């Protein structure tokens, strides 16, 4: 393989899948370093509204179509939400994500959230991003006007495979939301979930769809099977396959931020350190929405042990 090789089309990307792991990782590491050097960015999220979602996503513990025993609650009180954002603002995280379950916030909830965000000091607000479901162009413009420049909305998987995991919203509807994010002048944090039963071709088509949309911030999650969901019995990915997915994505999206998020402790286990060799340059630290993550202290120690450095630049 030549230095800084990238996959220009799905056929080239499929050839990468069968490469020896060490060869694949060498190329992925070179590509990561070419754009990000040894800088790693962290983000953390706040579960601001949990459960009772009307979507029927087969993997999701928050869907009311499933019966996973999780804590459910409406939008956090304003003071509590503000306090949790400010607390994360003291940590070395480049981004603080406010996440709500469900297809969309009500008008009253959205206005409340805007009020909380407006009350934040600028040095914290500029690090906040939001994941609030399907928003209109007007709502996205309101977020942009108060200082939010990034919005999270996943496509989850390939357009072909998506109907296998959700029927209450189409892939094209999700794509339209991402396009509205760009139309509002914001950057989109858009990725998905792996280990749903999708094929390698689905994964590669998904990566090229993100590239076609111009997505430059890609959260990568690995299925953590939840009880009482249709995918409760789905075997988790092996660590080797999960790392290979990251490396192939790096060859398709050479300059994008690849952020390893949900499922990291379960799927990668003792191989978590290898995410950077596989091409990732960012990770989510702390707990996820309804599952336990890895603590900030442990993640900082891991990054330091590898001779890498934490970058708090919110543009990453």
Curated annotation (Swiss-Prot):
Residue intervals of the Radical SAM core domain: 36-264
Record-linked Gene3D superfamilies: Aldolase class I
Keyword tRNA-binding: no
GO molecular function: 2 iron, 2 sulfur cluster binding; 4 iron, 4 sulfur cluster binding; biotin synthase activity; iron ion binding
Pathway given in the UniProt record: Cofactor biosynthesis; biotin biosynthesis; biotin from 7,8-diaminononanoate: step 2/2
Cofactor detail note: Binds 1 [4Fe-4S] cluster. The cluster is coordinated with 3 cysteines and an exchangeable S-adenosyl-L-methionine. Binds 1 [2Fe-2S] cluster. The cluster is coordinated with 3 cysteines and 1 arginine.
GO biological process: one example: biotin biosynthetic process
Keywords of the record: 2Fe-2S, 4Fe-4S, Biotin biosynthesis, Iron, Iron-sulfur, Metal-binding, S-adenosyl-L-methionine, Transferase
Annotated binding of [4Fe-4S] cluster, by residue: 53, 57, 60
Catalysed reactions, as listed in the record: (4R,5S)-dethiobiotin + (sulfur carrier)-SH + 2 reduced [2Fe-2S]-[ferredoxin] + 2 S-adenosyl-L-methionine = (sulfur carrier)-H + biotin + 2 5'-deoxyadenosine + 2 L-methionine + 2 oxidized [2Fe-2S]-[ferredoxin]
Enzyme class: transferase
CDD domains membership: Radical_SAM
The EC number(s) this enzyme carries: 2.8.1.6
Co-factor requirement: [4Fe-4S] cluster; [2Fe-2S] cluster
SMART domains: BATS, Elp3
Binding site for [2Fe-2S] cluster: 129, 189, 259
Complexes and interactors: Homodimer.
Function: Catalyzes the conversion of dethiobiotin (DTB) to biotin by the insertion of a sulfur atom into dethiobiotin via a radical-based mechanism.
Family indicated by similarity: Belongs to the radical SAM superfamily. Biotin synthase family.
Name of the protein described by the UniProt record: Biotin synthase
Lineage: Bacteria, Pseudomonadati, Thermodesulfobacteriota, Desulfovibrionia, Desulfovibrionales
């Amino acid at each position: 393989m030549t230095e800084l090789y990238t996959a220009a089309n799905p056929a080239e990307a499929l050839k990468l899948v069968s490469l020896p792991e060490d060869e694949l990782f060498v190329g992925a590491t070179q590509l990561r370093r070419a754009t990000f050097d040894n800088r790693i960015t962290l983000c953390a999220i706040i579960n601001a509204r949990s459960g009772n979602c009307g979507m029927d996503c087969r993997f999701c513990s928050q869907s009311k179509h499933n019966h996973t025993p999780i804590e459910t609650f409406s939008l956090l009180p304003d003071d509590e939400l503000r306090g949790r954002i400010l607390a994360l603002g003291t940590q070395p995280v480049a981004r603080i994500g406010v996440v709500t379950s469900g297809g969309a916030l009500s008008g009253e909830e959205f206005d409340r959230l805007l009020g909380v965000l407006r009350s934040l000091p600028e040095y914290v607000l500029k690090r906040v991003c939001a994941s609030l479901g399907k928003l209109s162009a007007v709502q996205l413009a309101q977020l942009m006007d108060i200082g939010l420049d990034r919005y999270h909305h996943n496509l989850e998987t390939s357009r072909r495979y998506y109907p296998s995991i959700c029927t209450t919203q189409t892939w094209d509807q999700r794509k339209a939301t991402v396009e509205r994010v760009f139309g509002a002048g914001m950057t989109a944090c858009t990725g998905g979930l792996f280990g749903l039963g999708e094929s390698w071709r689905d994964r590669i088509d998904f990566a090229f769809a993100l590239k076609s949309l111009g997505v430059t911030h890609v959260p990568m999650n690995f299925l953590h099977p939840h009880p009482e969901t249709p995918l409760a019995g789905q075997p988790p990915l092996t660590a080797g396959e999960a790392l290979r997915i990251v490396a192939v994505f790096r060859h398709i999206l050479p300059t994008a931020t690849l952020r390893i998020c949900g499922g990291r402790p379960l799927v990668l286990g003792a191989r978590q350190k290898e995410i950077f060799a596989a091409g990732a340059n960012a990770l989510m630290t702390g707990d996820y929405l309804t599952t336990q993550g890895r603590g900030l202290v442990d993640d900082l120690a891991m990054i330091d042990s590898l001779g890498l450095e934490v970058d708090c630049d919110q543009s990453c």
